[in-house]
Amino acid sequence: FPKAKIFLGDSGSYLLGSFIAITVIKTSIANPEISPFYFCIILFYLFFEVFFSFFRKLIKEKKSPMLPDEKHLHMLLYKMLLKKNTDKIKSNYYVSIFINTAYLILIIPAIFMMENGEFCKYYSLIFFIIYIFSYKKMSNKL
């Protein structure tokens, strides 16, 4: 992996996410045969991470949701890996590989079922459950 040259931070990530959302909405309108839930599946991690972090900070921690923190799912995974491996760069690589591979595995069935609204709706719920379960399990270990 090349060393990172760009750092977006939370606000930059939110801005980039907004651009992606606009693109997805336009694509969804142009292709009505594809279930809107399919797009939810494709973008689930990106958007749910934002909403989950926003409400976690605002409601649970009672602080500004615009303040950065290290309690995102990928940061929890990174911290867990650092406990076993002190090499920060390798731990960062492993987090990227793990999250992208897991996400790809979860998305593949949706690609083949993108026109089946019922499947995509319930599959979105599975994503939600997996995210919450993973987050709670990792946050309890730290």
Regions found by a protein language model. Give the residues of each.
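Alpha-helical transmembrane segments
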Residues: 1-142
